[in-house]
Amino acid sequence: PTGSAASGYEYVLRFSAPLVGDEREYTLRILAWDDAGNSAMRTVKIVYQTVSEGDDIGEATIRIDATTVGLGIVDEETVRIKQGDTAAQTVLQMLEDCGYEAGYDGLAEKNGGFYLMRLTRGDLLYRAQVPERLWTLIQRDGISLTGAPGRDSLGQHDYTWGAGWMYDVNGYYPGKGLSEWMLGDGDVLTLRFTLA
């Protein structure tokens, strides 16, 4: 497992792959308990079907959330997912299709260490303003301020030193980068700008 008790553990399951077009069913039994001795067991059936690289495997929704600067969801698109593509590759394609320029570090390919640093698009930050309550909390906590960015771009170190883009999938923050994550059919990936 990776992670910790505080943040939650993550496990990677590796099943032997069936031939292309075939499928295999696996049963996973999960037993978990807490410090008080309470326990629960869940059984999950996983159907593993192999498809060829590049084949269409479903749809996902990608959102861009700039609520922390008062803009809410600035874009939301349904995208096709291709077998073998990382979340980073899918996100970059969506951003390009929607007219964004993405500044990033690393590579979008699997295990490429991808980090989304900045999004740029004309008037992206038009009417942006950090909500007063959030700004008060940032100042109260002594977070180092850096100043507001220009009108067309939002990214790392804008407003505060801890600011940047994070992502969640279906409300869960994976403990790995976008180039280590693969999207599944029906997933909702949110790119969320944070200030701390």
Regions flagged by a language model, labelled:
Residues 1-196:
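Ubiquitin-like/PB1-type beta-grasp interaction modules and other compact soluble beta-rich domains
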